[in-house]
């Protein structure tokens, strides 16, 4: 019988632990943690993600210092806001919600964030510390994957992990974290040939490509662990909108030993890791 990796339940547990930590340290520090999420424009999906993050902040006791800017906001204006937040002692974490309008350079803005407040873990300083195996703020989605695997006591050492996708958000930091855990890592991508032959060798298969239901049961090794990072909105036969992953869940669940659902798998874990990074950064003020 396939075991479901319940990211939603684990995220709830993590948030409860973070809430207790905030309550216990708030008197010593003199204020709650503060997270500033910057959103530009009116992308509906981004709006949903930002509201989810703000709701999660409230549950844990983090002050949400979010700012919403009109679409025409300039690069210089956003840069000035980031510099002010870098200097603001009430702000522990800064996050720029992606995607941004086309006239804005997200990489340039990311570089302007103080690395110690980069709770998304995407600043070159934090990615460099990951590469070197040093402590630092970790990218939220791959960190959430690792935490979920740890919770279910899934052995990583010596296992062959295949990652589909090479983005700086998921694929590349995911590979580094798995290497840190002594896995043997293969990264496949849009130019990889004979994909099924690659995925069939995976003890742990992690998909982050954004292609609805591309992974079939025939592509999965019996007994594998399947982590579906993909979040795709599709229209079903009845004309209703629904969220699906990169994996054909029902058929792959017949083959895999463990599998994450979409929704309810990695999505909640990503938010939980964002909150954890924010609280951890804030808690250093005690020391």
UniProtKB/Swiss-Prot annotation:
GO terms for cellular component: cytosol. CDD domains: NAD_bind_m-THF_DH_Cyclohyd (cd01080). It holds the Pfam family THF_DHG_CYH. Gene3D superfamilies: Leucine Dehydrogenase, chain A, domain 1, NAD(P)-binding Rossmann-like Domain. It comes from the Bacteria. The keyword Oxidoreductase applies. NADP(+) binds at residues 165-167, 190, 231. GO terms for biological process: L-histidine biosynthetic process; methionine biosynthetic process; purine nucleotide biosynthetic process; tetrahydrofolate interconversion. Keywords: Amino-acid biosynthesis, Histidine biosynthesis, Hydrolase, Methionine biosynthesis, Multifunctional enzyme, NADP, One-carbon metabolism, Oxidoreductase, Purine biosynthesis. Signal peptide: none annotated. It catalyses: (6R)-5,10-methylene-5,6,7,8-tetrahydrofolate + NADP(+) = (6R)-5,10-methenyltetrahydrofolate + NADPH; (6R)-5,10-methenyltetrahydrofolate + H2O = (6R)-10-formyltetrahydrofolate + H(+). One of its GO terms (molecular function) is methenyltetrahydrofolate cyclohydrolase activity. The keyword Acetylation does not apply. Its EC number is 1.5.1.5, 3.5.4.9. Pathway: One-carbon metabolism; tetrahydrofolate interconversion. NCBIfam families: PRK10792.1 (NF008058), PRK14186.1 (NF010783). Homodimer. Belongs to the tetrahydrofolate dehydrogenase/cyclohydrolase family. Catalyzes the oxidation of 5,10-methylenetetrahydrofolate to 5,10-methenyltetrahydrofolate and then the hydrolysis of 5,10-methenyltetrahydrofolate to 10-formyltetrahydrofolate. This is Bifunctional protein FolD. It comes from Trichodesmium erythraeum (strain IMS101).
């Amino acid at each position: 019988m396939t075991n479901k990796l319940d990211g939603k339940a684990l995220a709830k547990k993590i948030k409860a632990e973070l809430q207790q930590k905030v309550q216990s340290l708030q008197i010593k520090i003199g204020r709650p943690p503060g997270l500033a999420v910057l959103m530009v424009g009116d992308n509906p999906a981004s709006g949903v993600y930002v509201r989810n993050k703000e709701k999660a902040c409230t549950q844990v006791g983090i002050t949400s210092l979010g700012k919403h800017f009109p679409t025409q906001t300039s690069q210089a204006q956003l840069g000035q806001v980031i510099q002010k937040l870098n200097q603001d002692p009430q702000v522990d974490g800064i996050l720029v919600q992606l995607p941004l309008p086309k006239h804005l350079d997200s990489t340039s803005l990311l570089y302007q964030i103080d690395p110690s407040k980069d709770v998304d873990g995407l600043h070159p300083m934090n990615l460099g510390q990951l590469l070197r195996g040093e402590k630092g703020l970790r990218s939220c989605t791959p960190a959430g994957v690792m935490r979920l695997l740890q919770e279910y006591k899934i052995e990583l050492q010596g296992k062959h992990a295949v990652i589909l996708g090479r983005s700086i958000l998921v694929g590349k930091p995911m590979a580094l974290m798995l290497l840190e855990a002594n896995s043997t890592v293969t990264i496949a991508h849009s130019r990889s040939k004979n994909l099924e032959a690659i995925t069939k060798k995976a003890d742990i298969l992690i998909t982050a490509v954004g292609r609805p239901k591309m992974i079939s049961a025939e592509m999965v090794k019996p007994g594998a662990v399947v982590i579906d990072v993909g979040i795709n909105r599709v229209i079903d036969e009845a004309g209703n909108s629904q969220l699906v992953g990169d994996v054909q869940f029902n058929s792959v669940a017949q083959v895999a030993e463990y599998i994450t659902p979409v929704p309810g798998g990695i999505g909640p874990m990503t938010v939980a890791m964002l909150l954890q990074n924010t609280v951890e950064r804030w808690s250093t003020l005690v020391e």
